[in-house]
């Protein structure tokens, strides 16, 4: 999960964490402060290449992210995700979205794991870019607004909001 709202939504899954041994893969450097509240988290892995590139661009407003640098940092993110998945061999990967969701979806499919995508609560009437990409491959899509079930043409399930 990414930092901000995506991370907060992941933390809202605390009852699920209590039932299963889990590994958290995030680009949120502050995860160490919040993860101890979750039970059964065996490890925290960081996929920082994409987040670091974003921070670099935020600090230097004159610099723009070129397609090549974007793809390069995304390739780095994919390598980090693959390394974590290879190390822990998950049976199920749950993603609360954003940049990390796409590589995790394809890695899950390649490794034979189930992939559950939780669309962000911020989207009420249309899909995120990540949602558009992973929807054909995800084993389950969970949305946080009833209207989004129709947006995903019945392929998504609604259980309410996480936060």
Locate predicted features.
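Conserved nucleotide-sugar phosphate-binding/catalytic loop shared by glycosyltransferases and other
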Residues: 1, 21-73, 147, 159
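Short amphipathic alpha-helix
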Residues: 6-18
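Well-ordered beta-strand positions
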Residues: 43, 92, 139-140
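An amphipathic, basic-hydrophobic alpha-helix
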Residues: 63-91
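Glycosyltransferases and closely related glycan-assembly transferases
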Residues: 82-92, 102-116, 132-133
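Short His-centered aromatic/hydrophobic patch
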Residues: 96-100
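Active-site-proximal region of nucleotide-activated glycan assembly enzymes
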Residues: 113-163
């Amino acid at each position: 999960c990414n930092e901000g709202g995506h991370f907060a939504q992941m933390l809202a899954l605390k009852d699920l964490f209590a039932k299963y041994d889990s590994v958290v893969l995030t680009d949120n450097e502050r995860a160490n402060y919040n993860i101890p509240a979750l039970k059964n988290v065996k490890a925290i892995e960081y996929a920082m290449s994409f987040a670091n590139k974003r921070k670099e661009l935020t600090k230097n407003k004159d610099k723009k992210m070129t397609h090549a640098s974007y793809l390069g940092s995304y390739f780095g993110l994919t390598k980090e995700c693959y390394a974590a998945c290879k190390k822990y061999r998950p049976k199920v990967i749950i993603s609360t979205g954003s940049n990390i969701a796409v590589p995790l979806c394809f890695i899950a499919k390649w490794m034979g794991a189930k992939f559950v995508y939780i669309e962000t609560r911020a989207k009420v009437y249309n899909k995120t870019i990540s949602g558009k990409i992973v929807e054909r491959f995800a084993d389950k899509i969970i949305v946080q607004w009833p209207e989004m079930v129709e947006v995903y043409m019945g392929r998504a399930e609604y259980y309410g909001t996480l936060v």
